[in-house]
């Protein structure tokens, strides 16, 4: 596995320079674009890393999986009364579909859906940001994971569109807490700093029927795990979920920080990171690396 990971990174490295970092978030525009890392974590606790796999980066929308899992953990099926689990077919920050469907987001991985999930968690936890940080520390086994307040503040300054979604949902009765408070929590979740190994380990319960082996916790039931993985497969990569299924064939979740996590049910979790994005907002080199890894090992679930 180690040799294969090293080879794959060398094969996709020429793609660096052909994408673009997420410069619409000022704090992310400064991230050196020439970084590339990958980590594979097995259900037996073994792992392999290559490249910049231990360099922390901003997880961004990958955090939407953590907040969804938290909400399912304390509220169960009730969360689906407030949002759906269908692909949207619209940009992740679109207001059009949200208006048409009367404030009920299509799924928890578009921004409107993630905001509803944050609203649900805001009602549950006295300190949602700290609860999220501690939850991720537990899942990853890394007690030093932190929130980059510079990134969170940077995103909050440019919050207008997300605020518009929240207020629109509030007008339809689907947002219960103070909008600005929930936005602060939302951007703090996105600003979690983790590396490839942290993320691969933190997501391993999704490859293991909801059981996190290193913490000894049953995070989700087997059925809930299947549900989360299915939404990742259909909606986890913005408008490129179909292309990801075609090329990689695994449930996955990406973020504009350049990270992508993929689940090999029953076996492994993989995280790849390269900051430069393609036109759909997903890591250009990361997509290519996961495609090579999946095809050479035969991991596709299809």
Swiss-Prot record:
Coiled coil: none
Key words of the record: Hydrolase
SUPFAM superfamilies found in the cross-reference section: beta-lactamase/transpeptidase-like
Enzyme Commission number(s) from the entry: 3.5.1.2
InterPro entries noted in UniProt: Beta-lactam/transpept-like, Glutaminase
Enzyme category, top tier: hydrolase
Keyword flag Lyase: no
Record-listed substrate binding positions: 61, 111, 155, 162, 186, 238, 256
Catalytic activity, reaction form: L-glutamine + H2O = L-glutamate + NH4(+)
Transmembrane segments: none
GO biological process: one example: glutamine catabolic process
Example of a GO MF term: glutaminase activity
Record's keyword annotation contains Hydrolase: yes
Self-association state and partner proteins as the record states: Homotetramer.
Family assignment from sequence similarity: Belongs to the glutaminase family.
Stated name of the protein: Glutaminase
Species per Swiss-Prot/TrEMBL record: Pseudomonas putida (strain ATCC 700007 / DSM 6899 / JCM 31910 / BCRC 17059 / LMG 24140 / F1)
Gene field: glsA
